[in-house]
Amino acid sequence: MGKLIEYISILLIVVLVLSACGKSSNKDEGVKDATKTEASKHKGGTLNVALTAPPSGVYSSLLNSTHADAVVEGYFNESLLAIDKKIRPKAYIASWKDIEPAKKIEFKIKKGIKWHDGNELKIDDWIYSIEVLANKDYEGAYYPSVENIQGAKDYHEGKADHISGLKKIDDYTMQVTFDKKQENYLTGFITGPLLSKKYLSDVPIKDLAKSDKIRKYPIGIGPYKVKKIVPGEAVQLVKFDDYWQGKPALDKINLKVIDQAQIIKAMEKGDIDVANDATGAMAKDAKSSNAGLKVLSAPSLDYGLIGFVSHDYDKKANKTGKVRPKYEDKELRKAMLYAIDREKWIKAFFNGYASEINSFVPSMHWIAADPKELNDYKYDPEKAKKILDKLGYKDRDGDGFREDPKGNKFEINFKHYSGSNPTFEPRTAAIKDFWEKVGLKTNVKLVEFGKYNEDLANASKDMEVYFRSWAGGTDPDPSDLYHTDRPQNEMRTVLPKSDQYLDDALDFDKVGIDEKKRKDIYVKWQKYMIDELPGLPMFQGKSITIVNDKVRNLDIEIGTDQSLYNLTKEA
């Protein structure tokens, strides 16, 4: 389910490229903005869009791209399925029908859809994209997303030259057979954006992510095609006249990386028309501006947490190793959460665009438990102190900070990724202050985003406690982030009971097509996890997009039938 805001779901990437993936709580948070701009039939012109973070340059979501990369990709490529307002898949470029429920499915893609190099989208492109993920030379994190296809394991291990469960019927149709029945067979399947077989098949799979065809000259099937890329700074796109839904309204789109603290000023000067992935602070500034700026916000699937790297990890083998005992006691983790005034922290840094959460599932998803069923870790520093005292974390030398139960110095090493968001440093400092008020000495460090991701992916020894934000996909299953055997399980949690719940919720023999049975299991999982507390849930947010008064045909609400090709700007 959850996907890092910097790591976008490949299961069904409907990147609403002009909005962040985020989720508000079910209660009224006091912020009521529009979700869309006015309609217009205007044609022509250039739209200037601010990117709040520099792309890494891996412009394919199948190859471990960052969120910034995926935002760029969303302008020139498209997924094969869309989602409705209930976050369920619906036909778009592809349609499907069950041959054998949860075991065999047939997909059909529309005819006449062209890649930017002029070649037609074919079912071979879909099969190629799946084979890339299953190939033994693939170095990304998404093999688990295809390993349940019949024959994928043999292909991955080099025992077969094709995946037996992928059967091409014709140029536009294929049948997929899975090893076993699984409830999320559709939402958990790879539905794009795809890779072009004709364009990329001459590049060795191990070199795809660093190839010029991905980094400098990427192609897609979307309404705009890449004209020029200035690495880490800008992407220029021009309309693709052969786009399958018709000629796009705009002539050009320029994506520019701009420091978040300067975006509103750039919009006031007319240099920027749209700021996606905006923050609450930016929304506040936009509302106080006299430049005719408009704030759009909508519920989405974003939540943030503080994680603990609990075990050693061998990335190459995808094997979890020895436990790291420092934060092994869940009562210590509970004390750390009780010590944080999340309500005050959210109010200070999110300006009404977030709320507290006591779950590892965004409340917008249908599997979300009723908050009343979950432990509520309301701010209670005295309770935190009592827990720490009971555990034996006491100040033995009179310096104001607690030693561990064995009398050794105890310091929390807390990291946050760096970036242009001006709240990163103060919100990290605020967490330090909360913990130190209950006697837990804390060291904080902001780390360059690329290194931060690498350190987490490798479970580096100096990565102990860290901050993350995740953006959910259409599949609500949380296995990607919390199952022991998943590469994206950055906390390296080893909780057999959690794994069993997650496995059972996808076991067709146990739940069939009964969503209530599946939800009941996920609710039990949420109750278990909020008690085990492998991480500290902090907030769930809203998506925010800021536009000037000329932008038209933009709707950021999840499930809207809007394509970028309609997006326009009045002269």
Identify the role of each PLM range.
Residues E38, K103, K334, I346, ...:
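Extracytoplasmic/peripheral linker and loop segments enriched in polar/acidic and small residues
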Residues A50-E100, E131, I219:
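N-terminal lobe/hinge region of extracytoplasmic solute-binding protein
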Residues S95-Y142, Q175, A266, K326-Y327:
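Aromatic- and charge-enriched surface segment that lines or borders ligand/interaction sites
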Residues Y143-D202:
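Surface-exposed binding/hinge segments that line
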Residues N184, F189-P248, K252, Q262, ...:
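Gly/Pro-rich hinge or "lid" segments in bacterial periplasmic/extracellular proteins
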Residues A209-R215, F240-A286, K441-N443:
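Ligand-site clamp/hinge motif
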Residues K326-D433, K524:
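Append "and occasionally in soluble cytosolic enzymes with long acidic Gly/Pro-rich linkers
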Residues V547-A571:
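Long beta-strand-rich cores associated with HINT superfamily self-processing modules
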